[in-house]
């Protein structure tokens, strides 16, 4: 029995060491490095666009003003924040560093975000014109719509981050 136990004890270290050389580093090609660089560049451009495009402070100021039916101190001119057209073109056309499904999801979410943002600020302008006409009923309807649009904008932003996060984490490795 002692010989059997001794043989088993000797066999385990040999079996566990014979699995091959685990010190080899994974082979990374130039294409992988270029792809990772494209992902990081796209992500950084996205961060800039998202930060500049939908400023939570401005959205909340518009909603607060609308909530008070224009009785709050007049807002300084609120205009949609400017976004560099080159950057918006980049985020709407993600490169081949992403698979087709991811590219489609990014395009859909950015398109939805751009549309919601445009409608949000257009509604605010219309809201102000309704207030001048003392048309409180239609103004109230726009407040409800803008609350929905602000929620949509937040959801689109979160979706974009959720889509990009796994790719950027992988690219940073």
Residues covered by each model-derived region:
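Bacterial N-terminal signal peptides that target proteins for export
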Residues: 1-3
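Extended amphipathic alpha-helical interaction segments
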Residues: 120, 143-173
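Immediate post-signal-peptide N-terminus of mature secreted/exported proteins
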Residues: 22-74, 143-147, 173
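Bacterial signal peptide processing site
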Residues: 18-20
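Long, amphipathic, charge-rich alpha-helical segments that form helical bundles/coiled-coils
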Residues: 77-136, 143-146
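Heptad-repeat coiled-coil alpha-helices
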Residues: 52-55, 59-63, 122, 126-129, ...
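C-terminal motif of bacterial Sec signal peptides marking the signal peptidase cleavage site
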Residues: 13-16
